[in-house]
């Protein structure tokens, strides 16, 4: 009796049968598959914390073996970017303040929902690009973790850079007016 490969004229792919550390790649794949199958079967049936920890460790080890190193490095870099995702501390302090007289009785902070006028001395700031108003304390906490407006999710740092460039160009034009 002939094999499937012989009947269909398929030649054996040499890379499937390369010996790597004494076992072929196909054997390694079978081992990984059986480990993953056992892991997923037992994953929800753990009785103690130690079992769950060992299962998750095994899962991470298997995934690290299966994923290319370049992809692992890319994911680690993306995770590191997320840690320092907030605005500089000076950004919130530099935002323009809103005068108490310009606030309406119905104006509330969109983060904490506190009425601005309940406070005797409200510290209300406005984001320059979208003109959304927030309590300074609430916005400072938000901007320490994110670079977006809490309401519209627009990037506040990108607009700040554009505004700085525009004011610099305007100042340069004014200076040239003195000499012309």
UniProtKB/Swiss-Prot annotation:
Please give the biological process terms from Gene Ontology that the record holds: protein ubiquitination
- The modified positions for N-acetylserine read 2
Its GO CC terms?
cytoplasm
User: What are the cysteine partners in each disulfide bond?
Assistant: none
Where exactly are the zinc fingers annotated as RING-type? 109-153
The answer to keyword Protease applying to this record is no
What keywords appear on the UniProt entry? Acetylation, Metal-binding, Zinc, Zinc-finger
Which SMART domains does this entry report, sorted A to Z? RING
Region Disordered, annotated ranges: 1-31
UniProt name for this protein: Uncharacterized RING finger protein YBR062C
Q: Which organism is it from?
A: Saccharomyces cerevisiae (strain ATCC 204508 / S288c)
């Amino acid at each position: 009796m002939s094999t499937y490969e012989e009947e269909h004229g398929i030649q054996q792919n040499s890379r499937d049968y390369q010996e790597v550390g004494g076992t072929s790649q196909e054997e390694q794949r079978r081992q990984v598959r059986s480990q993953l199958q056992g892991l997923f079967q037992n994953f929800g049936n753990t009785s103690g914390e130690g079992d769950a920890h060992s299962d998750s460790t095994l899962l991470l080890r298997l995934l690290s073996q299966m994923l290319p190193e370049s992809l692992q490095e890319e994911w680690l870099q993306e995770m590191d970017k997320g840690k320092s995702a907030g605005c500089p501390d000076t950004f919130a302090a530099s935002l323009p303040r809103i005068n108490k007289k310009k606030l309406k009785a119905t104006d509330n902070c969109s983060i904490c929902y506190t009425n601005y006028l309940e406070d005797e001395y409200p510290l209300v700031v406005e984001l320059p690009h979208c003109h959304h108003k927030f309590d300074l304390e609430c916005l400072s906490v938000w901007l320490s973790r994110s670079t977006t407006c809490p309401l519209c999710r627009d990037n506040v740092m990108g607009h700040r850079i554009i505004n700085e460039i525009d004011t610099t160009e305007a100042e340069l034009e004014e200076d040239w007016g003195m000499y012309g």
